[in-house]
Amino acid sequence: MNLLPKTREEFAQTDYWNEFFKKRGEKAFEWYGEYLDLCDHIHKYIKPVDKILMLGCGNSKLSMDMYDSEYRDITNIDISPVAVKKMLEQNARTRPDMKFLQMDATAMTFPDESFSVALDKGTLDALFVDDAPETKAVVENYFKEILRTMRNGGRYFCVSLLQEHILNFLVEFLPRHNCMLRIVHCLGVEQANKEKNADDAMKMPVFVVIATKFKSLPMPILEFGLGNDKMQRFTESSELSNAVRSVQKAALVFNGLARSSIAGHDEVTLDLYRPSENTPRYSIYILDQAAARGLNKYAAFIVPQGREIEWLFGTPSGRKKLQASAKFQRLAVVTLHRDQVYNTLEEVQAELGDTVFSLAPHGHIKQIPYLSLGSDVGKRETLISGFSKISGEFRIEEVEAGGKTLRRLIFLSNQFVVQSEALVKTIKIKGKKERKKIDFGYLACQHHLYMSVGVQLATTLQNPKKDVQKDVLVIGLGGGGLCSFLHAALPQSRITAVEIDPIMLEVAEQYFELKQDKRFHVVIDDGLAFVERCRNEDIHFDAVLFDVDSKDLSLGMSCPPQGFLAHDVLLHIKEIIGPKGLFMLNLVCRDETLKTEAIANLQKVFPAVCSYKLEEDINEVVYCANDEKYKTVEHWQKAMGTAGRGLNTTIKEHKLASEDPLEVAEFLSELKL
């Protein structure tokens, strides 16, 4: 494994440790591995010429196996005379040069700098049973003796489970005593434990601690490895501790998922990082559903690049639907992150292999199937990276999805939400180079289609004079997709878009082919200030649309910002649209209390309010009118039915689509007061 797992869930680690040791008793120390499991690390850090001190040998075979592998200068000590006598009898003939001495490791009688390696397999964990002051005093004596008897440049090599109090002590004590400290996740031991304890779903990560003694160190040297040769270097001890804890927390997730199903509960999320990187390379969402006839056991689903923002892959409810259609009791949904390079699907599977295996239900030994939408990892190309003073960092990306090329505006502050999306078509002209063109008939956001029905109603049915252009105000431009669509589909409309961020106008013009003309212009201004000015100057619009998001992601309402629903703002809108106009807003609200409050505020100002809730999104399009004839849902349905059919017709007439984009009957059936 070369990926560091970090879970987003919290667990009571102390309880888990207690259960681990209670369950195993004396057998807990079998968990530290044998020579074959540790030999890669031993050979890397200990040489046959080293003078080795084995601390607390007990009845371990480790020193015997090392002796048989040409490590001949080994001195074993143990506080138990029974253990020492037994080991002497066992090794006197076959390993005559190996020494066994009864000695307390906290008060050794060896001269200073006698050894080049001090080897500890579980002895520290046996000594350091709790964080009591008297225990800590014993451990400090233990380390002082180790460092006293160790030569400069010598190594303390320790196999440990690194309980929290042990880890905290090591990262503080050893650097303070001029030791370079390296901690390596020992995957070989874990794999062996899985094989030897196949019936035991409870697993704990094992670590090798390597502390190298120096005369002096001007600054701490702290490193962490995931079992490969690549080390991550830190400047702060807390960073090293956090790396270890990330592996331990992930193990708790793996153990919990191995031991029980989470069917009926929320999904569990895991992020995977490369060493030395602060942004995740993969995110994994683990879902369970109850066992049933026809369901297979376990699979992983790899979402191609750029598709992770789609409802099916980017939301908990979408992923549940994906699991149901895939027909697996457990599904691990893997998403790939931007600013990472992924070559082939096979390479991604290989990189994920250890983690995906660790997430399997207990006892699952079959090969794990990998599912995806195709045979590759998808394509994501960044066209530009930019910065907005209002919205922060943003990207313009092109992704391949379902045989289409989509151009997207993404704000990195909320990068799983697409701010704007356009369909890119390739135009072939005989004798000329192919060029890309934005398809203005493509509406990525479904709520834009339902807002457009309202615009059709306000500009044709409410004001039927064909020779008079109808004025439409859109607050919030983004990439300009909605405005470009309205401009192309409704030639009798005259559109004013208000955008607070001047960078967004540049983006819309340069990357989404937004074009201003006599029927469409953009005003750079604060939307609320513009609305107030229109009211004060007696400027009217046939339709007003709020399609603006909140920059405060902590609030339960994402669209619009709460200030846009203030009573005085709504009164301004009421005057601006006049007796025949229509006000529409995109309401995105996860908090039911806030949502109810928002609708109530609208109903206080407008005599007629109705809404349409999108099926797969949390978006709800709310329509508000001053015309009291719309007080019943039947009147809304009649007017919206005519407007919807008219919108379908004009879209096809202007060659923006070949088929009706709006399912009129379904739309009308879901309209609610």
From Swiss-Prot:
PANTHER family per UniProt: EEF1A LYSINE METHYLTRANSFERASE 4, SAM-DEPENDENT METHYLTRANSFERASE SUPERFAMILY PROTEIN
Organism ancestry: Eukaryota, Metazoa, Ecdysozoa, Arthropoda, Hexapoda
Any Gene Ontology biological process: methylation
One Pfam short name: Methyltransf_31
Family statement: Belongs to the methyltransferase superfamily.
Family annotation (CDD domains): AdoMet_MTases
Entry protein name: eEF1A lysine and N-terminal methyltransferase homolog
Record's keyword annotation contains Methyltransferase: yes
Physiological role: Dual methyltransferase. It catalyzes N-terminal methylation of target proteins via its C-terminus. It catalyzes dimethylation on lysine residues of target proteins via its N-terminus.
Keywords, alphabetical: Methyltransferase, Multifunctional enzyme, Transferase
InterPro entries found in the cross-reference section: Lys/N-term_MeTrsfase_sf, Methyltranfer_dom, SAM-dependent_MTases_sf
Domain of life from the UniProt record: Eukaryota
Catalyzed reactions per annotation: L-lysyl-[protein] + S-adenosyl-L-methionine = N(6)-methyl-L-lysyl-[protein] + S-adenosyl-L-homocysteine + H(+); N(6)-methyl-L-lysyl-[protein] + S-adenosyl-L-methionine = N(6),N(6)-dimethyl-L-lysyl-[protein] + S-adenosyl-L-homocysteine + H(+); N-terminal glycyl-L-lysyl-L-glutamyl-[protein] + 3 S-adenosyl-L-methionine = N-terminal N,N,N-trimethyl-glycyl-L-lysyl-L-glutamyl-[protein] + 3 S-adenosyl-L-homocysteine + 3 H(+)
Enzyme nomenclature, EC number: 2.1.1.-
GO molecular function: protein-lysine N-methyltransferase activity
